[in-house]
Amino acid sequence: MQVTETLTEGLKRGFTVVVPGSDLSEKREKRLAELSKTMQMPGFRPGKVPLSMVRKRFGDAVAAEVMEASVNEATERMINDRSLRPAVQPKVEVVRAEPDSDLEFTVELEVLPEVTIPDLKAISLTRPKAPVTEAEIDEAIARFAEQRAETEVVTEDRPAATGDILTVDFLGKRDGVPFEGGAGTDTDIELGGSGFIPGFAEQMEGMKAGETKVITVTFPEQYHAAELAGKEATFDITAKALKRRVAPVIDDAFAEANGFENLAEFRKFFADRLEQSRAGASRLKVKRALLDKLAEQADFPAPASLVDAEFAEIWRQVEAEKQAGRLDEEDAGKDEETLRADYRAIAERRVRLGLLVAEIGRTNNVQITEQDMRRAMIAEMQQFPGQEKMIMEFYQKNPRALDRLRGPIFEDKVVDYALELATVTDEEVSAEALFADTDD
């Protein structure tokens, strides 16, 4: 085999490979001989079909098979001999493959860059932490109890106030004429609640059971009924009953009714949930800070093929958000050229950071265990109650789909490794500060 390097430009490499025709001829004859041992043909005993007849019947197919195998073997050998690390699958193009002549083909590829791992011990990070207070546990339990509140009719003669529930009949009109979908009977309206036209519920505050009132509202510009969007309308309101929510008393009996031995166990459950939530937010913040530090030091070139693939995936998501009208305000104000440039820079950063994280893991023998994979699968199944069996069967039938789980696991294990070496200082912050920007 003869290999000539034709391109060395940045991370791009090009080669011309020539495999002697004699090698191909030898492989073809060997393959034909193998076929002759099993080939059956009328008039001949099994394995006794003349090689000339085997060649006539299978010659072209064997030639194609041998050529493909030779290209693959020669490419792999060439890459291994030169210790190349392709970024993506090499591009191979056959130049010459005539019978009884040498096989000539070209190989073009991008190699992974030389990645220098920064001194992880020199990295300093701050890890925000927000201790759970007794008052916050009280608030969490109170919200839980409020969700299980029952309603009761208000018997005293008083006007409706924020937090009350007013049972009403209403009739909407435009220019004095009732419009479709604008009427309701015995409808419970929570004063101060959401989900109504702005100003609708608010104008019912102060009404008493038995009273009537005409209110005026303006429908939102983005209202689902186009004929009403941005239009003014009136509603005839008849208040029929005033109700209020009565939250259950938070005591041992309430705790027992919800599956706990006593109030102390109930409080511990909520304390643990709050702690877990904050531990997750704290972990996310310090992980982001670490990855930002690593990204700053990932100053090696990024393979264009990987950047192109990453950008294509990002841009598909951007286009989907744009079509759904969910593009954020900042991006919506940019022209496409600027938007593409911004997201290509993000794609390049992701590729560089991914290569650095991969190199840290490879160099330090970070491994994904079967236990890691089981935990990840259990976590995924917990997100879809009742579909556990279907998810398990999916992964059993599609082993390559497990790569989607391996990536995040590997990244987290590398982060754990790096955090053990870095200097991490805990800083107490408020819960609001801890959770700020954690949903980006």
Curated annotation (Swiss-Prot):
Q: Name one GO biological process term.
A: protein transport
Membrane-crossing segments per the record: none
Catalysed conversion reaction: [protein]-peptidylproline (omega=180) = [protein]-peptidylproline (omega=0)
Subcellular location(s): the record lists:
Cytoplasm
Q: Which residues form the PPIase FKBP-type domain?
A: 163-248
Enumerate the GO terms in the molecular function aspect: peptidyl-prolyl cis-trans isomerase activity; protein folding chaperone; ribosome binding
Domain of life, per lineage: Bacteria
Q: Which UniProt keywords apply?
A: Cell cycle, Cell division, Chaperone, Cytoplasm, Isomerase, Rotamase
**EC number(s) on file:** 5.2.1.8
Disulfide-bond pairs as recorded: none
Main localization of the protein?
A: cytoplasm
Spell out the Pfam families in the cross-references: FKBP_C, Trigger_C, Trigger_N
Q: Mind telling me which GO cellular component terms the entry cites?
A: cytoplasm
Q: Which InterPro entries match?
A: PPIase_dom_sf, PPIase_FKBP_dom, Trig_fac, Trigger_fac_C, Trigger_fac_C_sf, Trigger_fac_ribosome-bd_bac, Trigger_fac_ribosome-bd_sf, Trigger_fact/SurA_dom_sf
Q: What is known of its domains?
A: Consists of 3 domains; the N-terminus binds the ribosome, the middle domain has PPIase activity, while the C-terminus has intrinsic chaperone activity on its own.
Q: Which PANTHER family match?
A: TRIGGER FACTOR CHAPERONE AND PEPTIDYL-PROLYL CIS/TRANS ISOMERASE, TRIGGER FACTOR-LIKE PROTEIN TIG, CHLOROPLASTIC
- Functional summary from the UniProt entry: Involved in protein export. Acts as a chaperone by maintaining the newly synthesized protein in an open conformation. Functions as a peptidyl-prolyl cis-trans isomerase.
- Family to which the UniProt record says this protein belongs: Belongs to the FKBP-type PPIase family. Tig subfamily.
Q: What is this protein called?
A: Trigger factor
Biological source species: Acidiphilium cryptum (strain JF-5)
